[in-house]
Amino acid sequence: QRALFSLENPTTLPKEGLPVKALNDALLSDVLFIEIRPGWQSDVPLHIVSIGCGDHVGFSSKIFVSAGENCHVDIVESHAGEYGSTYFSSCVSNIDIKAGARLGHYKLQNDTDTSTHLALTQTSIESDAVYDNFVMSVGGILSRNEVRSFIAASGVECCVNGAYLGTSNQ
């Protein structure tokens, strides 16, 4: 069975049933590629910051992560907005975790109270690898964080957690 995607051929993602991805593809404005070498380990997380600003604008980003065999790294994503601004944010993350790798992926979605945030995280996880995901959503009039994982072999640990803190008219 084929993984959801590959960095070598990112077009292998299915189009059906992925409306956030389809919208992201249509509006794509920024792409980030992160390749973590096999065996590389870090106690310091990689921090990706996305700041929305301006009124009635939209931006769309895509993140590709390839975690090499037996590497160990944490990635933190922070999404925030300029106070008072109203915008639309779409983010798709494609993460490929090779055999024996450990990847922590933690996201704080704290956009403005009048903004919309749609996100999709897709992972492909190989044998004896670990993927730990946590999403905290505290901002936005509307927010969606979808996580899909393809477990490609045995011995995989995949942990997906999240929390929403709704206030006012969210």
Enumerate the language-model features and the residues they cover:
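Conserved beta-strand/loop scaffold segments within soluble protein domains that form the structured core
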Residues: 3-170
